[in-house]
Amino acid sequence: MKKSHLFLIIVAVLIIGWFFVRFLFGGNEDSWIKDSRGVWVKHGNPSETPDSVNEQQVAILCAENLYESFTILTVEISSQCLGTCGDYAIDIVHAPRTEEDNLIENQCEDYRSGNVSHFIELDKEGNVVRIV
């Protein structure tokens, strides 16, 4: 057998082996992943929704409702804490974020004191900037 044929067979076996290992151990393509803002989004068509994803989705809806209630009351929205939704503090920040947003005194008291574990940052228009 020629060396070139042997080389091609070895390359073909390696490629087939790589695909086998990739699909056998590569993990589930249908899952949930976090986008750049920290929001859980579907990746493919996951069969189940984890509790942490449901909790975050409920908190985002609650945050949107809090924001709407402040705007209906014609309260001027600036850099302030709107309240809490479950285990999330809801905070208004600049978009894009500034150093002022990182100051500890500008974070929600419930988050600073440990009453909640996460926070949702909204911009002045009510859009999610970041979730931690």
Explain the meaning of each model-derived region:
Residues M1, L24-F25:
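Short, aromatic- and cysteine-enriched interfacial helices/patches
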Residues M1-A12:
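N-terminal Sec-pathway targeting helices
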Residues F7-I9, D30, Q57:
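Alpha-helical interaction segments
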Residues I9-V11, G17, N106:
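Low-complexity, intrinsically disordered/propeptide-like segments
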Residues L14-L24:
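Hydrophobic alpha-helical membrane-insertion segments, chiefly the h-region
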Residues G27-D30, V75-S113, H118:
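Exposed beta-strand-loop-beta-strand "reactive/processing" segments of non-cytosolic proteins
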Residues G27-N28, S36, N45-S79:
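Short, non-transmembrane alpha-helical segments in secretory-pathway proteins
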Residues N28-I33, G38-E48, Q107-V132:
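A short, surface-exposed interaction/processing loop segment used at functional sites
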